[in-house]
């Protein structure tokens, strides 16, 4: 394995299986951006088309989710979130595998993700946080690909420039109308601002809320 030194003298591998080529940190302001923003898919609503469906499973089928894709979630529900676990349970029953899980963060309530890693449903994680027991198990090497951890701002940048492409974003919205307009201000599970999910809603190929 070949290595390059970063700005603080630490040797960083040139390439990691499951991630690809690595660019070492060269120092503050050392690299000027040359990329363009990724283009979001253009969408149109056919007259009288209904966006509401009867179940999460039906929504997943309509999204076209398949093996090898990337799915995302936000973490505004903090340790009370059940959406990640419920969605992965449904995806598992549908037989979909080899997914990259790209949430804004994962909390202690997401321990059930461990079983989906072991069964091959989830093979990669890109997040801004991992906590026990999930983090402990991943540290033991149960995940097929190396985890990518970014700051919250770094995650938004990665989605905007296409480094992290989201195929289907699952947005836990306390309130949402049939046109897809949503907010966190009202509803039984009102959580306040949903800033972490904005970039997902803007750039994901499909949004399920």
Feature map (PLM): residue ranges:
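Conserved alpha/beta enzyme-core scaffold
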Residues: 1-209
